[in-house]
């Protein structure tokens, strides 16, 4: 016999809001300083040249330029922004 009454549906019904993670500006796109490039949990993608890393691991542009994604090692991606003349 059950010690507790079956109350499945009334105890469920919680869900968190979407966090809108992912790449916001892709390789080859032009960005301004402060433009968010990637929103992520942890450093799945590492910061490269001319980008900053926020407290929540958001990668953002520090200069005006073009976004490039680089394969740094076999299992590490890096994103940089390079100025265009």
UniProtKB/Swiss-Prot annotation:
Keywords: Ribonucleoprotein, Ribosomal protein. GO terms for cellular component: cytosolic large ribosomal subunit. The keyword Ribosomal protein applies. InterPro entries: Ribosomal_bL27, Ribosomal_bL27_CS. One of its GO terms (biological process) is translation. PROSITE patterns: RIBOSOMAL_L27. Residues 1-26 are annotated as: Disordered. Pfam families: Ribosomal_L27. GO terms for molecular function: structural constituent of ribosome. Belongs to the bacterial ribosomal protein bL27 family. PANTHER family: LARGE RIBOSOMAL SUBUNIT PROTEIN BL27M, RIBOSOMAL PROTEIN L27. This is Large ribosomal subunit protein bL27. The gene is rpmA.
């Amino acid at each position: 016999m059950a010690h507790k009454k079956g109350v499945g549906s009334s105890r469920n019904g919680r869900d968190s809001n979407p966090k809108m993670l992912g790449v916001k500006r892709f390789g080859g796109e032009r960005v301004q300083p402060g433009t968010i490039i990637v929103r992520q949990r942890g450093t799945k993608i590492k910061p490269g040249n001319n980008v900053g890393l926020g407290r929540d691991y958001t990668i953002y542009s520090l200069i005006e330029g073009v976004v490039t994604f680089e394969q740094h090692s076999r299992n590490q991606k890096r994103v940089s922004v390079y100025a265009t003349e």
